[in-house]
Amino acid sequence: MAAKEVKFHSDAREKMLRGVNILADAVKVTLGPKGRNVVIDKSFGAPRITKDGVTVAKEIELEDKFENMGAQMVREVASKTSDLAGDGTTTATVLAQAIVKEGAKAVASGMNPMDLKRGIDKAVEAIVQELKTNARKVTRNDEIAQVGTISANGDAEIGRFLAEAMQKVGNEGVITVEEAKTAETELEVVEGMQFDRGYLSPYFITNQDKMRVELEEPYVLIHEKKLSNLQALLPVLEAVVQSSKPLLIIAEDVEGEALATLVVNKLRGGLKVAAVKAPGFGDRRKAMLEDIAILTGGTAISEDLGIKLENVTLEMLGRAKKVVIEKENTTIVDGAGSKDEIQGRVSQIKSQIEETTSDYDKEKLQERLAKLAGGVAVIRVGGSTEVEVKERKDRVDDAMHATRAAVEEGVLPGGGVALLRAAKALDSVQAENEDQKHGIEIVRRAIEAPVRQIAENAGAEGSIIVGKLREKPEFGWGWNAQTNAFGDLYNEGVIDPVKVVRTALQDAASVAGLLVTTEAMVAEKPKKEPAVPAMPAGGMDF
């Protein structure tokens, strides 16, 4: 086992604080509408330019092991905030730095670290409650656009695209961000349920120009096994022909004689039909077929339910307003399923998302949720160069998470003002002793840090801005760094989602509290590499 180096007390805290400061100082220059960019060198390709706090934090690795531990703890703050709220990573880093700085001073002066931490925790709880009390619900489209614009560093186009996407696919819908092949940014919305399986035979195509199958008001037959013989299906196929409606068959596979029979019937005009493979694999395939059944108001025919193909009736088939099948995907628009059943299925998937620990499963469940609840929107981000596209994509990602968070929990005045205003909640927090009281005061001072940093990045004096904000107690009144003017931030569209502000403070205080209560640090001793002997000169004999 390699030898370890151990540091104690103030020696450990100093090293750790130095690491915290290096990382936080690099991240905090990006805060606010006039925040600067950070250029990150890459081992391959062009350098990356970003204004996203968590991207900067993830790139920082320090040579000194003890300093690096401090930096990594704050990096964890940014990552956690990014995972939970998707934005607010720079605010979280600034808050963590402020709490650790003040906390380290207090411990050095002889205060009890555990009581300080208890005081910090009490203060954070009170502020979070105050933030929730003052939250405003977001309902209008222009408010969603404002949140997106603020998060995208004042880019109104991004805000507009996000508001439009959320309007089209709903709050549960999936919005994905991709890099465009052109210089323009564009939005594409797929309404209804889409899955990545196309037609099994080109003979099913009804629209030759667009090379796709279009079925108006079709019946939908959902079967979890392979279909190789249609004998058992004849009664239901005849009933579909009588109704003169088209039919979509979704099965594990349709092969051989069954596929040939369907194609011949389609070409002769007896039965408007198309067949596609079922989406997904294994258990997820079964779940997705049940989703389609609930969406279309049909029954997924499976042996588990004891339903045989020969017993299938028209009532067991699903219905939809329209189905469009392309070479590689199928879209079911406006399924005839009951709203209550769809809502019940949505709630079930939501609880599965909360319970799962796997990121992969969570992503797949969210995709299923979106397909049931609304649709999928794709924002393709354009730019003149690859570097510009990547930088813009970072901002769109931030903005997308911020708009989601805003719809979820509401909004507060932005620019760090909400935290400053919430400080009044600390007046009623009861401390058990002087050290706890000092912990509460640490948070009172720390929550000024975001406003000060935004002001400094905009070239203003942080203390003067904070002083002026204190003169007027109205919750929504604050300083707009973009215009360098005071006013009602709600009216000016300077707003932050409650979830982002709350998560930033909670995560920052959680990690900062751990750093303040650290008394010893252990790291591996750096190995002294033996010097490599010089190569002998060529052509010499030994």
Curated annotation (Swiss-Prot):
GO biological process assignments: protein refolding
Q: Which species is this record about?
A: Mesorhizobium japonicum (strain LMG 29417 / CECT 9101 / MAFF 303099) (Mesorhizobium loti (strain MAFF 303099))
Glycosyltransferase is among the record's keywords: no
Taxonomic lineage is: Bacteria, Pseudomonadati, Pseudomonadota, Alphaproteobacteria, Hyphomicrobiales
Q: Which residues bind ATP?
A: T30, L31, G32, P33, K51, D87, G88, T89, T90, T91, G415, D496
Which UniProt keyword terms apply here?
Answer: ATP-binding, Chaperone, Cytoplasm, Isomerase, Nucleotide-binding
Catalysed reaction, written as an equation: ATP + H2O + a folded polypeptide = ADP + phosphate + an unfolded polypeptide
- Superkingdom, taxonomy of origin: Bacteria
Q: Give its E.C. classification number.
A: 5.6.1.7
Q: What is this protein called?
A: Chaperonin GroEL 2
NCBIfam families hit by this protein: GroEL, PRK00013.1, PRK12849.1, PRK12850.1, PRK12851.1
Query: Molecular function terms in GO for this entry?
Result: ATP binding; ATP-dependent protein folding chaperone; isomerase activity; unfolded protein binding
| Family stated for the protein in its record | Belongs to the chaperonin (HSP60) family.
Task: Give me the Gene Ontology terms describing cellular component.
Answer: cytoplasm
CDD domains documented for this protein:
GroEL
Q: What does this protein do?
A: Together with its co-chaperonin GroES, plays an essential role in assisting protein folding. The GroEL-GroES system forms a nano-cage that allows encapsulation of the non-native substrate proteins and provides a physical environment optimized to promote and accelerate protein folding.
